[in-house]
């Protein structure tokens, strides 16, 4: 599916993520939001959900002086912006960044209270892509990949399990849930082998 709104989301995401790379790599960051949108499109052709997937990291990772929540509301409306907010870690201007566990706890709380079913599609696709990359990189670099993160591999596994426990209760396609569950299980196998 390709629409004017999806095209606009791709253009804005490419512009605002310019110069950013995937964690611990030289891969341009735009590959992630595009992949999330593509994963979502395997399970639904809902334009709102696909656009939210493409935009999902902007409010969390982009300086509001470059592209703000108000810009997103203007360009994409309240529903898409609210979905993106629901999948974003909270930012507090002028405050130091919270520790990894505190950020994830806050994220899970926000996610658990989301009004939009689309939120869970976006989160599942985001985690599917992140875990796919982690597992592929693990195959190539082994335990070296864990140095990229501000958390232990055990904490990363537990976090993904907690996210899945929220998603599995929601009316999203069983195939999407199974895809995510299989990746979490593979991560669990790695953590069990190399504690």
Q: How should each PLM-predicted stretch be described?
A:
Residues 1-195:
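Active-site helical microenvironments for divalent-metal-assisted chemistry
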């Amino acid at each position: 599916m390709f629409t004017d709104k999806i095209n606009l989301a791709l253009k804005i995401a490419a512009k605002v993520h310019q110069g950013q790379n995937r964690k611990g790599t030289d891969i341009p960051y735009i590959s992630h939001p595009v992949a999330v949108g593509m994963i979502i499109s395997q399970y639904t052709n809902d334009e709102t959900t696909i656009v939210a997937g493409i935009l999902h990291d902007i409010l969390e990772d982009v300086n509001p002086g470059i592209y703000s929540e108000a810009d997103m509301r203007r360009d994409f409306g309240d529903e898409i912006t609210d979905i993106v907010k629901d999948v974003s870690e909270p930012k507090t201007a002028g405050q130091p960044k919270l520790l990894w566990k505190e950020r994830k706890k806050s994220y899970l709380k926000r996610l658990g209270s989301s009004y939009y079913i689309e939120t869970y599609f976006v989160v599942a696709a985001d985690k599917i892509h992140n875990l796919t990359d982690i597992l592929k990189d693990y195959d190539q670099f082994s335990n070296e990949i864990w140095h990229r993160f501000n958390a232990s591999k055990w904490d990363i596994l537990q976090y993904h399990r907690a996210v899945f426990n929220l998603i599995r209760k929601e009316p999203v396609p069983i195939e999407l849930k199974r895809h995510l569950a299989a990746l979490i299980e593979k991560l669990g196998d790695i953590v069990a082998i190399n504690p």
